[in-house]
């Protein structure tokens, strides 16, 4: 979902060549969820939020509650912020180093809890494949990239051939690692084992480089953890993030 009914339908436009335009995509999905929740033991729903639709999350929760009824305990809402990419000029995305993003996550988590919905988040960095010698992305032309999000971006191009992938990956990591910068910037940071200096793809989006900058999220992590402790753990009595 991309918001409440109005926003979601503006962003998820029905293909007029395939579907009747009189149909409401948002309501159709809600009806499907009602049916699916009566069949399956667990359903995961993703809610993409930005600086506009975050304020309509409670309306979405009310609609979802009305749709699934007594089966709401089967629903898990995955909260994920919309971020910048090199392919768009969208101005309402969140900078993932910003404290505002941390506070918005907490607000959405609180709303989920109050409505009785389970949730998970995409706040913390996932393990990165960019400097891994055991992972790569293969495109439809047989080119090898170091990052799953980097399709067509030459800075992440490992090789134009699938021959001798191992040596190509070794050479790429040796040439493109930012270990010397991380050693200086992250030496005393308790989050280093979690983020390992941040995401190379996000560095590219923000700075145009994959090795000369650090997309540091320390202040965002500090804010999220302290806000979670005060607003969720203490006030709501919830001890963990699913």
Which role does the model predict for each range below?
Residues 12, 148, 199:
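Short, flexible helix/strand-to-coil boundary loops that buttress conserved ligand/catalytic motifs
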Residues 13-17, 163-167, 211:
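Short glycine/proline- and charge-enriched loop/turn segments
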Residues 94-123, 149-196:
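C-terminal accessory region of radical SAM enzymes
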Residues 62, 162-165, 205, 235:
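Short, charged/polar low-complexity linear motifs in solvent-exposed/disordered segments
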Residues 155, 181-242:
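Radical SAM enzyme core and accessory elements
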Residues 2, 6-133, 137-141, 160:
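Radical SAM enzyme [4Fe-4S]-AdoMet core and its adjacent flexible, acidic
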């Amino acid at each position: 979902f991309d918001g409440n009914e109005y926003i979601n339908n503006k962003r998820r436009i029905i293909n007029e060549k395939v579907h009747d335009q009189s149909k409401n995509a948002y309501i159709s999905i809600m009806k499907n969820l009602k049916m699916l929740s009566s069949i399956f033991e667990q359903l995961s729903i993703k809610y993409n939020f930005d600086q506009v639709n975050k304020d309509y999350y409670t309306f979405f929760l009310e609609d979802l509650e009305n749709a699934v009824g007594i089966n709401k305990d089967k629903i898990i809402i995955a909260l994920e912020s919309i971020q910048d990419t090199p392919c768009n000029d969208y101005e309402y995305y969140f900078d993932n180093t910003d404290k505002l993003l941390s506070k918005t996550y907490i607000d959405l988590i609180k709303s989920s809890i109050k409505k009785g919905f389970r949730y998970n988040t995409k706040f913390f960095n996932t393990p990165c494949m960019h400097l891994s010698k055991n992972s790569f992305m293969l495109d439809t032309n047989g080119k090898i990239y170091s990052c799953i999000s980097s399709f067509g971006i030459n800075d992440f191009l490992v090789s134009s051939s699938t021959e001798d992938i191992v040596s190509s990956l070794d050479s790429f990591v040796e040439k493109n690692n930012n270990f010397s910068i991380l050693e200086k910037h992250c030496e005393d940071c308790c989050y280093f084992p979690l983020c390992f200096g941040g995401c190379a793809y996000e560095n590219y989006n923000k700075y145009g480089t994959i090795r000369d900058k650090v997309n540091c999220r320390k202040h965002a992590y500090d804010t999220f953890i302290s806000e979670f402790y005060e607003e969720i753990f203490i006030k709501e009595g919830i001890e963990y993030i699913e």
